[in-house]
Amino acid sequence: MRPMSRRSLDWTYSLLLLAIVLLSWGFVIYASTVAARRQLQKEFPDKFF
């Protein structure tokens, strides 16, 4: 693998960090919606969510 310049290395690391942050926030939002739906099904078992 050929050596990368400092600018492209910084750009790659920032892009990787952004992808990690977006994935973690997506997981947090997904988990909270699943927990909220589970709580609603527990409180209102006759409704469909």
Curated annotation (Swiss-Prot):
<keyword id="KW-1133">Transmembrane helix</keyword>
<keyword id="KW-0812">Transmembrane</keyword>
<keyword id="KW-0472">Membrane</keyword>
<protein>
    <recommendedName>
        <fullName>Small integral membrane protein 27</fullName>
    </recommendedName>
</protein>
<dbReference type="GO" id="GO:0016020">
    <property type="term" value="C:membrane"/>
</dbReference>
<feature type="transmembrane region" description="Helical">
    <location>
        <begin position="11"/>
        <end position="31"/>
    </location>
</feature>
